[in-house]
Swiss-Prot record:
GO cellular component: cytosol; small ribosomal subunit
Name the record gives this protein: Small ribosomal subunit protein bS20
Gene3D superfamilies: Ribosomal protein S20
SUPFAM superfamilies named among the record's database cross-references: Ribosomal protein S20
Similarity comment: Belongs to the bacterial ribosomal protein bS20 family.
UniProt-annotated stretches for the region Disordered: 1-25
Keywords noted in UniProt: Ribonucleoprotein, Ribosomal protein, RNA-binding, rRNA-binding
Natural source organism: Myxococcus xanthus (strain DK1622)
Length: 91
């Protein structure tokens, strides 16, 4: 347990940050999962909307510092690549 006032404060801060990070990570996970599911569907508009919302969630998480900038960029890139592949398969 924390022995000093500053350590207690840092612990409180870390708990707040952890709660915030868990929420943001959950939102990102949900957005990416729905985008992956949309890739399997035949609806092109649904697919592009899902990819856009996932990319937005990933970018926001990177801006907030929850995800590293390059991690978010890599995930967005992979989603876009999968979307292109799915679009070609449908055509």
């Amino acid at each position: 347990m924390a022995n000093t006032k500053s350590a207690e404060k840092r612990h409180r801060q870390s708990l707040k940050r952890r709660a915030r990070n868990v929420t943001v990570r959950g939102e990102v996970k949900t957005a990416v999962k729905s985008a992956r599911e949309a890739l399997g569907s035949k609806d092109g508009a649904k697919m592009t909307d899902a990819i856009k919302s996932a990319a937005k969630a990933l970018s926001k998480a990177a801006t907030k510092g929850v995800l590293h900038k390059r991690t978010a960029s890599r995930r967005i890139s992979r989603l876009a690549k999968a979307a292109t592949k799915a679009a070609r398969a449908q055509a």
